[in-house]
Amino acid sequence: MLRVSAFRLLGRRGASRVSLLEDFSFRYYSSGPLGVRDDTRDSRAYFTTPIFYVNAAPHIGHLYSALLADALCRHHRLRVPSDAATGFSTGTDEHGLKIQQAAAAAGLAPSELCDRVSAQFQQLFREADISSTDFIRTTEARHRIAVQHFWGMLKSRGLLYKGLYEGWYCASDECFLPEAKVTRQPGPSGDLCPVSLESGHPVSWTKEENYIFRLSQFREPLQQWLRGDPQAITPEPFHHTVLQWLEEELPDLSVSRRSSHLHWGIPVPGDDSQTIYVWLDALVNYLTVVGYPDAEFKSWWPNTSHIIGKDILKFHAIYWPALLLGAGMSPPHRIYVHSHWTVCGQKMSKSLGNVVDPRTCLDRYTVDGFRYFLLRQGVPSWDCDYYDEKVVKLLDSELADALGGLLNRCTANKINPSGIYPAFCATCFPSEPGLVGPSGRAQAEDYALVSAVATLPKQVADHYDNFQIYKALEAVSSCVRQTNGFVQRHAPWKLNWESPVDAPWLGTVLHVALECLRVFGTLLQPVTPSLADRLLSRLGVSSTERSLGELHFLSRFYGHPSPFEGRRLGPETGVLFPRLDQSRSWLVKAHKT
């Protein structure tokens, strides 16, 4: 989406540093519930993905960003079940020289190319059940208004000036590079040619007069912000990386290009000879979505959580907060950063023909299955590897066998012929192990299960707060295994409903297992929404009983009435998740060629 830029400044910087910083102020928030400030008067929260550049079709990295944001947003809604209080935006970044050139090469107007590729992202996100409340396109009129107003704020505060920049420019990446980011590699003729150290694309020496943002004035305010809030950027290694970057001087930053060179973008207000640089234009999308420049945006900002890939960290953790401070606003509440996906140990690349088509994967592994795989296997702190066999093994083991098998066992007509939530017998399973009497049949492992599932919602919430969704799913999977062990240990299929000795314990075993399943279904809603809906519907859990506030696990065990005891189960919903290895004939590489 965004590309790193840096220049050697030749123009005058002008205004005094002290006078520029006097107006900057900070509001700090602690690591309370995800996306919610300590001082907020309501539960309003705003989640964003990056906006995706329309120079190529979507791949699984794009989908992964969207799924992380979707899961965080859905989990927040479980905590505060009000869609009106939660915003979630995604979209496409549609300006810039690469779009201008790609459209010309394809014989299309830039707007036609943007329409075509943006539609692909929108279709993918619909198919993947991404619950965004807004899809922003930077070619929209509302965005142009927001960007030009933001520009005016920076200019009115003395933070923009015209100057001559000279430096290496990479046309493919649409960015300027410092000398340290340029290397030499043999070209087609064998001569050493300058290329970008990060992308390998050719660079050329360029000199150009542009508008310049006084980024150099913001090094100390940014350090103050990050040192005052250790969780502002999560995971911690990325927070540390940004602080390391800030140990070096920040050069002022080009924020426009000559319109004769770049016409596909938003003009600088009052100067049609310049076009606002695409990366500044793109960042302002986060404000556009919440109504900027109208006053309504203040009810959302800065209560905002950005979910981004590590390749655009500098834009979101240095340039964007500095621009916001310059415009008189606070930095976002949280910046959640994730790493990338490789394919069979290699970086995804068109030249290697190994770019994974996410729509093929959604079709092959089901929407819920592929969502679960990416969020279960993706670890934000480091790159993760994809291959088809790994998907099949994980989904068959955890969704088809463990979770689906558990639901099938506990609702099967042979074991639960009445089709109800059976009664819990407190004498069979007393609340304290020491209270076990002649009728008590619960074992130490059973109490460990109850304890694990009772604490699971808090554990999962903590993992979400720490941007460790994979750990949340690992914790759920562990409890599913424990519950299967509980059922296997007590073998309800060997007990007899007609026996006055067996019946109370048989009902209790099923009641405990169904209560565990209800917790699992509730906690899986952010990750596998359709599967979780089928599971909860099979248990007879209504739509108003699916928030975290309504969970109340195993009330009867704690001496309270249960609204589920004696309730009829919901209608049969079929196999919860079909095994994938039973249809291996279709297991081919889901890659574009």
Curated annotation (Swiss-Prot):
GO molecular function term, any single one: ATP binding
Short motif 'HIGH' region, span: 52-62
Top-tier EC class: ligase
Primary localisation category: mitochondrion
EC numbers: 6.1.1.10
Motif ('KMSKS' region): 347-351
Pfam families: Anticodon_3, tRNA-synt_1g
One term under GO cellular component: mitochondrion
SUPFAM superfamilies: Anticodon-binding domain of a subclass of class I aminoacyl-tRNA synthetases, Nucleotidylyl transferase
GO terms under biological process: methionyl-tRNA aminoacylation
InterPro entries in the record: Anticodon_Met (IPR041872), Met-tRNA_synth (IPR014758), Met-tRNA_synth_2 (IPR023457), Methionyl/Leucyl_tRNA_Synth (IPR015413), MetRS_core (IPR033911), Rossmann-like_a/b/a_fold (IPR014729), tRNAsynth_Ia_anticodon-bd (IPR009080)
Keyword field: Aminoacyl-tRNA synthetase, ATP-binding, Ligase, Mitochondrion, Nucleotide-binding, Protein biosynthesis, Transit peptide
Keyword Cell inner membrane recorded: no
Mitochondrion listed as a keyword: yes
Highest taxon listed in the record's lineage: Eukaryota
Catalytic function, reaction form: tRNA(Met) + L-methionine + ATP = L-methionyl-tRNA(Met) + AMP + diphosphate
Protein localization: Mitochondrion matrix
Binding-site residues for ATP, renumbered to this chain: K350
Family affiliation: Belongs to the class-I aminoacyl-tRNA synthetase family.
Full protein name: Methionine--tRNA ligase, mitochondrial
Species in which this protein is naturally found: Bos taurus
Biological classification of the source: Eukaryota, Metazoa, Chordata, Craniata, Vertebrata
